[in-house]
């Protein structure tokens, strides 16, 4: 587009300075509705920026006058075109109101200018003709500067100009008003003085050093998103954000790490990634001294100490300490599972869960414990594992005082006191304290066994069962009794064994008062009172109250 046309600056041999007489109307660039309709969204955005910048600069000179209607329209987010006037006063679009009464001798104007060609590429119509002031394309991406020009004269009685001038960058006095477009960088003498923020948002009172920054900010309040992606239709409030978004479609990743070669779409992501190599963690929690690579991670962490949960689900009222967790939660209500595994077709509501799941297929365990060398497929599991070495249990139950190494474990424990079971099975109605227990239970109905032993091919519905099974092959017995030194492959088995030394029998029968050291033994015992025999022989139909008794009975049929 050609450069934006601004009114020539009227000045004469008056004793008052030009600045004292300059008003916003003298330099405003007004549009008719037809001209406004012809602009694309990007041009409209640039027009808004230039007009607001112009007004801000005029105001900064301390000149009197009320706020023009067009500025009020822009602040309200309305279309800033002016109504066409009737007859000879019909708007010329790009010119302010008083310009309709002026006639410009373009030949004189251009010959007075330092032998430079007119920046608007007007054509000479002859010495006796007035210049054709028909609108040219409105705004360019180059800098537009309004400053002092050679003195012109206006005959106020006849409303005829004796001279007129095209504005030239060479004639600028830098003490005058300067209007700059968004796309050009400010030179030091053009920038707003350091620390000064003259542009204030009328909605929230926030101040900015440039009007273009104010305009971008105001789109938060108006919801305006003029920059639209031509591929997917997604809209953005800033052109720079659209440029970054386009890289999703093009696959462009121009920012490459010098250490490992990993590439990123956005420079800020590369800067954060560099901290992995340098080990830099500049953001430290004042409560517990834990440090983070990103400020956002610190802010999220601090909510553990404050208990703040600012993100509330509008459907169920549940609150979260991070916006991404809220978005993931909302998919519980919508049933949306946008992340699909290419190997088995299983879908997930959270991308992180998909990545964890894919490691089942690849066997990848990228998170290694620095203490014992044990590797894990999930970082959160490694963090929990670290507490085995440190013994740290920072989360305490307010009911019973029991402490836990992880906050989620505390939350699950608290449901023992409240008896809350928020996760119900749609098939049978059985409810569970933990969501993971529901998922595992649902495999009873589906028959799914996604966890397969690499040694013998045996499959399991729960990952924990696979881990326990693998110890049969490895012979690992990580749980040792401190009393007698006996080792066990399962922690639960160690707990039961310890009761041999303590004599503890916490499970008591309500019918006869007999106590047991194991919950499973209590369940078997209670069948004596109820007469329940859930284990039935497929050969003869005989039923038993214990699974072990059924196994023994079936050997009778095999001998026959």
Curated annotation (Swiss-Prot):
Q: What is its subcellular localisation?
A: Nucleus
Q: Where is this cross-link: Glycyl lysine isopeptide (Lys-Gly) (interchain with G-Cter in SUMO2)?
A: 125, 136, 148, 162, 225, 421
Q: Where is the KRAB domain?
A: 22-93
Q: Which InterPro entries match?
A: C2H2-ZF_domain, KRAB, KRAB_dom_sf, Znf_C2H2_sf, Znf_C2H2_type
Q: Which Gene Ontology BP annotations are present?
A: regulation of transcription by RNA polymerase II
PROSITE patterns, from UniProt?
KRAB (PS50805), ZINC_FINGER_C2H2_1 (PS00028), ZINC_FINGER_C2H2_2 (PS50157)
Tell me what this protein is called: Zinc finger protein 250
Taxonomic source organism: Homo sapiens (Human)
């Amino acid at each position: 587009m050609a450069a934006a046309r601004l009114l020539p600056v009227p000045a004469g041999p008056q004793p008052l300075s030009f600045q004292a007489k300059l008003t916003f109307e003298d330099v405003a660039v007004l549009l008719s509705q037809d001209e406004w309709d012809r602009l694309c969204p990007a041009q409209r955005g640039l027009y808004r920026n230039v007009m607001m910048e112009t007004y801000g600069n005029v105001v900064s000179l301390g000149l009197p006058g009320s706020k023009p209607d067009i500025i009020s329209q822009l602040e309200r987010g309305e279309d800033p075109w002016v109504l066409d006037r009737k007859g000879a006063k019909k708007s010329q679009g790009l010119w302010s109101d008083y310009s309709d009464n002026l006639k410009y001798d373009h030949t004189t104007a251009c010959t007075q200018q330092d032998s430079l060609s007119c920046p608007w590429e007007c054509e000479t119509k002859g010495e006796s003709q007035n210049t054709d002031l028909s609108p040219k394309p409105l705004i360019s991406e180059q800098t537009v500067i309004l400053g002092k020009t050679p003195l012109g004269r206006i005959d106020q009685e006849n409303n005829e100009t004796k001279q007129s001038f095209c504005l030239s960058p060479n004639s600028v006095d830098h003490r005058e008003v300067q209007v700059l477009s968004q796309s050009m960088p400010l030179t030091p003498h053009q920038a707003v003085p350091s620390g000064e923020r003259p542009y204030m948002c009328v909605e929230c009172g926030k101040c900015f050093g440039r009007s273009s920054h104010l305009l971008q900010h105001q789109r938060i309040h108006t919801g305006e998103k003029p920059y639209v992606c031509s591929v997917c239709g997604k809209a953005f409030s800033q052109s720079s954000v659209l440029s970054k978004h386009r890289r999703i479609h093009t696959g462009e990743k121009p920012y490459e790490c010098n250490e490992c070669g990993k590439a990123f779409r956005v420079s800020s992501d590369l800067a954060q990634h560099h901290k992995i190599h340098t080990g830099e963690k500049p953001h430290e929690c004042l409560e517990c001294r834990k440090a983070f690579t990103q400020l956002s991670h610190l802010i999220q962490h601090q909510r553990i100490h404050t208990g703040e949960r600012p993100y509330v689900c509008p459907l169920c009222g549940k609150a979260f300490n991070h916006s991404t967790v809220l978005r993931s939660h909302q998919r519980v209500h919508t049933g949306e599972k946008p992340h699909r595994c290419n190997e088995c077709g299983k879908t997930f509501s959270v991308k992180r869960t998909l990545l964890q799941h894919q490691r089942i297929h690849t066997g990848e365990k990228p998170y290694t414990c620095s203490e014992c060398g044990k590797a894990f497929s999930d970082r959160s599991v490694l963090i929990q594992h670290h507490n085995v070495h440190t013994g740290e249990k920072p989360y305490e139950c307010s009911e019973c005082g029991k402490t836990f190494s992880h906050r989620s474990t505390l939350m699950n424990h608290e449901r023992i006191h409240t008896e809350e079971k928020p996760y119900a099975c749609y098939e049978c109605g059985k409810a569970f304290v933990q969501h993971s227990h529901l998922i595992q239970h649902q495999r009873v109905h589906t028959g799914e066994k996604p966890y397969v032993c690499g040694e013998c091919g045996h499959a399991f519905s729960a990952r924990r069962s696979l881990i326990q099974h693998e110890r049969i092959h490895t012979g690992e017995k990580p749980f040792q009794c401190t009393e007698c030194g006996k080792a066990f492959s399962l922690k639960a088995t160690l707990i039961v064994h310890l009761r041999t030394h303590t004599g503890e029998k916490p499970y008591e029968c309500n019918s006869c008062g007999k106590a047991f050291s194991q919950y499973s033994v209590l369940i078997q015992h209670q069948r004596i009172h109820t007469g329940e025999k859930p284990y039935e022989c497929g050969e003869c139909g005989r039923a038993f109250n214990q699974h072990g008794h059924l196994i023994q009975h079936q050997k009778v049929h095999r001998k026959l």
